[in-house]
Amino acid sequence: MDDTEGNSSMDSIRNGQSSPLPQVTPRLPQIPMMMRETPLSTKRERQAITPRFRRPAPKMIKTMPPTRSIWSVRKESVPLLVTPQGPKPLESPKYDHTNAQSFFEQVFQIDEIIGRGSFGEVFAARCREDSQLYAVKVSLAPIRQHSISKYREAESHMIIPPHKNLVKFYRAWEETGRLYIQTELCDQSLLKYCTEKHALPEDEIWNIFVDLLQAVHHLHSNDMIHDDIKPENIFLTKDMICKLGDFGLVINLKNPNDVKSAEEGDSKYLAPEVLNGRPTKSSDIFSLGMTILEATTDLDVPSNGDSWHQIRNGQIPDRFFAGISTDLRSLIALMLDSDPRIRPTSRDLLDHPVIKKKLMKRGTYVKCISILNGFFYAFSAVLVWVMAFFSVLFHPIVRFHAAIKDRQSEICAQFVNNQQHTPIQTPETSKVYLESLTGVAVRQASQIVSPFDFSDDENPPNAQRRLFTGAVPCRLNFDNDQDDDEEQATCSSSNSSAIEPQLDEPESPPRMNDVIDKLGKRGTPRSARRNLTFNRHRQVAASVAPKSSLNHYNHHTGSGDGFSNNSLIPISDQERTEKYLRMRLTEQQLDWADQNNVIDEAPPPMSCPPRIRRSIRDLPRMPVLNFNVLDEPSNKPTVDHHTILEQSESPRRRLNRGAKPVPRNRMMSFGSSGDEV
């Protein structure tokens, strides 16, 4: 291979290829010159150079999977409260021993999972006892009954005195072989906060440094070692107050068992002397320095390798400290010293002049926040108490007022029910309609009716108007009391009626015998007989009067309630039945004729089209009103509107009008009205 080929291959390795070959691991893009000096990099730079591919999934191994959720295994046990004196039965007004659910499920309302690790899961849950949000940590692995560190974390929380920069502990209990720890709920972790912002302002770094230093000093003053200080175990409240939590690896120097069973924390923040020995207070200072270094420089802290030793040897490039003050950089260098004897203690750091100044400023801020929070909580408690007091005070008055309103509604309903009047456009599903005479007659009489109504009413698009039989047959007599012009009263769900002409005889109209046979099996509707025999006391007086006077009375008197004028004449049951049958037959013939003239298009909304009215109904057009005629002289020749209407009629209408006119009765019933022509 010649030199040109060798140089091209070396350049491709140094600069990287723009498009990697298939089936080949993609190479990293070109690394900046500042990063060639050291393998250390920031988190943002690491995200930019990380290859965007995933390794293949490992092969499936048919073994028993580990328990990864608290819901997978459940044992029947009684919840035990963990106390310094030993476990005790746990009681709560929200807990029912007979319920199959656990104490955690009954007393808490689980909102979400906010953390998950090798030890367990952390839930954000609202307690039903006080309606406050808490963080509940649940162990995944069942607790070993004879283990020395069975309640180690819970006991550490109870031994350590409360501090403003430590996560507040409430209680811990054991149930179904698992440990539950209830603590206060913070807004977010420091790891999440730094990952979102990458580079934090120096003022925020000083505040975090001062808060954590006070928490570590509080632990060291009580002979406790945290042994797991890292951004993941540091939490921020909504007021940006930093708190140290997760006491799972806390070592009590007063307890020999804790010293013997001490475990190593996260290797990223581990002091070098812990690899060959045990954790000490100086190792906590080193972990605190690594946490402040990561928050200040956004450094991607390595967990092993040469970079891990490079940081512990103090070989950190200056480019990571760009824009950082000398005081903060010198303090970080002191805490990261490889010799634990040279590292300052928490007391030495608090006595530093710069930290003293920052501590005084931070203390003022924390006191103001605590005062405001206390005032807010007190005001909330008073407000809740006042609301509860007024609720109890005015509750009887509100109930009394509601009872009065209900009684008023009942009285109004009784007054309306006493009125024997069915309103216009009453739906058939109405209780008032079903109990009325019309509703009873409609349910009892199964008469074939026309499915269409071509009245000038508001109709929904593509909807059919259903007609139903009226309760009482009525008629308008225009001759010498003949029965040929009798017609059964029908009504529709509209507020207008129309006089329809009787069309020619249909091709196959219903026969009288069929109607008689149909009615003979069922009989005359009881409501019709009751309506036709209305006002018996007046019928007795009418039977004595001469027939001519009755006819005269019928011709010139009309009742607006839908009753027949001739109903006052006493007739026998047989005559009444025959008249009723003739009326039904006449209406069926008319409906049959209407069905033969159905037009296959639905009337538009709001009104019936004029062309449908002109082609179906034999009604004269509405004349155009000209009000100027009233102002003109009266000697003008009068216009015969009937002649104009006859001339403008279509040939089909003239043909229909040439037939023998058959008088039609009005279509009327209770609650409806018609326009006379």
Curated annotation (Swiss-Prot):
Keyword Transmembrane helix: no
Organism name: Caenorhabditis elegans
Gene: wee-1.3
Pfam families xrefs: Pkinase (PF00069)
Lineage: superkingdom: Eukaryota
Keywords noted in UniProt: ATP-binding, Cell cycle, Cytoplasm, Developmental protein, Differentiation, Golgi apparatus, Kinase, Magnesium, Membrane, Metal-binding, Nucleotide-binding, Oogenesis, Serine/threonine-protein kinase, Spermatogenesis, Transferase
Region spans: Disordered: 1-30, 478-526, 632-677
Protein name from the UniProt record: Membrane-associated tyrosine- and threonine-specific cdc2-inhibitory kinase wee-1.3
TM stretches of this protein: none
